[in-house]
Amino acid sequence: MKQITFASRNHQLTNINTWTPDSQWLVYDVRPSGASFTGETIERVNVVTGEVEVIYRATDGAHVGVVTVHPAQEKYVFIHGPKNPDADWHYDFHHRQGVIAHHGQVSNLDAMDITSPFTPGALRGGSHVHVFSPNGQLVSFTYNDHVLHVRDAKLDLRNVGVAAPYGPVNPPGNHPREYPGTYWSVLVSRTTPNPQPGSDEINRAYEEGWVGNDRLAFIGDTLSATGEKVPELFIVNLPEDEQSWKRVGDAPLQGTAETLPAPPAGVKQRRLTFTHQRAYPGLVNVPRHWVRSNPEGAQIAFLMRDDNGIVQLWLISPEGGEPRQLTRNGSDIQSAFNWHPAGDRLGFVLENRIACCDAQTGQVTFLTSDHGNPPSADAVVFSPDGRFIAWMEETDGFRQLWLAETAQN
């Protein structure tokens, strides 16, 4: 177990894709806390030498964070807040965008057009937590809508979207805050402000994860028969080619003044879990976690309470069926989790230590002990070569990056 960063400030890992493809560098942002989006740099640290490099530095009062890496290239995607923020337009869920840094060049991922009649392939608000698909072709994100937020904040429902490499998209620029994008961006989830209780309708889609390269799983908030929020697992199939990404379904891709952007034709949202009758219904929101498929795309892992109320890892097929309880721990899993690249185990925080469980048996192995402070719940991430696992931990008053080897010595 070794400390990797030492500077007297916070270092924030995203919950997946935080390593360069060669397993040599960890990328991070420098937000003073997860909730305060005020970092100015995206950086990386060499896990062997400790060398630190600045990948991108924001200017004009903008802030940046939540960086992830392309699976095969040193291409970084992250959130960029507004330049020259003012009272009317400053960082918010519906005022942020994805940008890609590659070989020192920076380009917009998503375009934004907030002036009716809007532009197909452009968003109308903010994108967040951008994650490349396993083959590096597509980028998933969560989304909030400026147009509906201004109309009524209750209509601005969080959704899941995908940016596909079929740009550029160039809105007319009728508003000074609009911008072009290099990718074609659409929503792939469907929400409604008032879901029918007991139905498959949802009012929030979030915490998505890739299932292979052509499907996305995510958490969707349903309502029980008595109107209680119950987070369930959903999956969507994605278009296969440029024509399909641009094909209009039953509503405009770009949305209207009254409605959110709609998914392309043929994108079907399907519910995978049905937990309303369980002793502890629903996937858990604490710890905050992103649903994650194994590398083969054959099993989706998520966190849910067992009948004793303990947060455990569960697995389900993307085709559906009954979820299988994987872990049988005596206390809660305490963090987001990830699959080892070999697909044979998952890593997370348990009993304030870094732990792995076997993907078949659920048997837990601890990789660390004697932490000064508990590891952060935000991220536990394996290196692409599978040799290391990284996390964050408060050390002398600042959040630092730490590493352990995954091999059992």
What are these regions (language model features)?
Residues 1-409:
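Sequence signature of WD/YWTD-type beta-propeller architectures
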